[in-house]
């Protein structure tokens, strides 16, 4: 099968491409590398800045590349906004992809109209990036996302593509829950793909427990990293001889992985029900995740045995108490590390996941 993957979020498409190639598929990945993270790709769509001039150059570059994006059996776009262009500019390229290829699939892997809408209804989720119970989280960054996706052209584009495409793949429970009321027939859930980490066959814990926290300055409040860091600093003050904090800010993915490899515990995404790509990458390396591990996460995977994730409620005290509990029961950490790796092997192995994609794409091709 000839497959085109367009766009990138958190290494999802790059890892999926590896799995598909391992299964003998012909895959091309075109993306801008998810900005400064610089994930691998075959065709580079990187945009240097948000200036108008740079936008014109990027538009012309993509227009020139479009003949290379024809005659594929399957095209999958990472998001409705799958190119480094304004939403209004996408229709031209989307229609070309539809005309000149086989089936087209939409990824529900990140910020989009249906995810924002589900968070704001204060019913779909007990808590999310956009709500705590019945209260909407009004923060500057949240308000920008709400404006962009619910009130602006991004939302219009999202609704158009979701209605027009051949299928929708959700990579997390939250995204699945956002789309399910509207597209139950064309929607499926497939776990994010993760490569097995050969250098982490037997993860060990040193004298101090190393707590890893990745910080995106522009999204710290939105993702709850600021709250998690405050709780972690309190733990460090309480147990100075038992723990160490590894802080990482806005580094490329390869450097991020290197710094993560020597850690024991990762703190990630306070408002999530589920572990996303960074947490899953950490689990493959034998780290224990403190973050989203709600029952819905295990239910959608049909996982009735493993519980490797330290689930926290979206507040500082919950994070603090769970971190203290980890330190006071550090003897359990080696077992939790092994469970993390088994969880990844069972549900997220990139070759198994790639086969699930092939099965879904083929099921739609037969209709």
Language-model-detected regions and their locations in the chain:
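Membrane-proximal helix-turn-helix segments that form the acceptor-binding/catalytic region
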Residues: 63, 69-70, 93-99, 129-167
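Short hydrophobic beta-strand element within catalytic cores of glycosyltransferases
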Residues: 288-295
